Amino acid sequence: MSKQRLNNLFFFLGIAAVIVMLFTFDVSFVELWEHICHAGYWLIPIVGVWIIIYGINALSWREIIRSKTASSPEESGKPGFWRIFRLTITGYALNYATPVGGLGGEPYRILELSKDISGQHAASSVILYAMMHFFAHFWFWFSSIFIYLGLAAIGDLPINTAIATVLGIIIVFCLIFFWIFSRGYRKGLVVSTLHLLGRIPGLKGWSGCQLEKRGETFRNIDQQIASLYAEDKRAFYRSLVLEYLSRVVQSSEVLFMLLLFGIDCGGGFTGITLTYLHAILIVSFTTLFANLIGFLPMQLGVQEGGFVLSIAALGLSAALGIFVSIICRVREIIWIVVGILLMKLK
């Protein structure tokens, strides 16, 4: 299949996803419109802040693409920021849309990026960025535990045996994956993943065939993955910090919705700061919940349930959780539309 046909396939997949999402809201169109009207002008910063978030994501990805271990003199300065920014938005739009939740945008990014740089460089940079995206997630979840404990220490949030147990499980969960990521960054990930898939009944033949045909290519990609951390730690940590920062900025959309409902912890600088920390915890728990069940197409129902549970855990009303989940779904649809339109922008 030609690259143009694949591009068209991704384009129509995105359109189909928007249609499905419009008809799978848990509320009627009348109720949906009421929620949008309730958001009012707050919808502008809620949607608009994602320009900043995607911009930070693009800067993080650019650090990987332009790292001294991956780029060659012929590829110096390629691709430009605007190109990376567009592919970032479109990639995430496809991630929201595809049945393999959170992974559908990667093949498209490799396909498009290979027009600017070598295929191996494109594949390794996309894989590295996907790893960095998830790695930053774990650091976000891990640090959120200490935010919760800090707020509990000042009496702002409850703490008991059940909550402490859950927090302890999350800490262990994060530490295990920190170890897995450390191995991936030291030795690469592609070949080991194919070997692992080969142990699954029915996939042994396919895995062996891929290693036989493209083994050298996969080993070269793994070498580029491993060399980022080993030889260009500055680019690695800059990319990680930027990805982590994007999660913090993402929490501002929940902050806007809390302020919309008059929830500001007493107002003033201290009150707004506490509210922002609550927003970070809400986003952290919701994204953890959504990623644990991330295989669902468009994470239907998962994000909504995560918002309701996380908001209720902070002692806020379930109605607020439903409102936040619906407005976030509206924001996703808007950005999916933007993403698929950018696919056709030359």
Residues covered by each model-derived region:
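Mid-bilayer segments of alpha-helical transmembrane spans in multi-pass integral membrane proteins
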Residues: 92-101, 117, 130-142, 146
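Membrane-interface alpha-helices at helix entry/exit sites of multi-pass transporters
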Residues: 81-83, 116-131, 317-327
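Predominantly cytoplasmic-facing regulatory/coupling regions of multi-pass membrane proteins
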Residues: 1-89, 157-290, 322-324, 331, ...
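Juxtamembrane helix-boundary/capping and inter-helix hinge elements in multi-pass membrane proteins
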Residues: 69-78, 113-122, 313-319, 346
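Re-entrant/interfacial helical elements at transmembrane boundaries that shape
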Residues: 102-114, 143, 295-313
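Transmembrane alpha-helix termini and helix-breaking/packing motifs in multi-pass membrane transporters
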Residues: 141-155, 313
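Short intracellular "coupling" helices and adjacent cytoplasmic loop segments at the cytosolic face
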Residues: 89-107, 204-208
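Transmembrane alpha-helix interface/packing and boundary motifs in multi-pass membrane proteins
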Residues: 93-100, 281-304
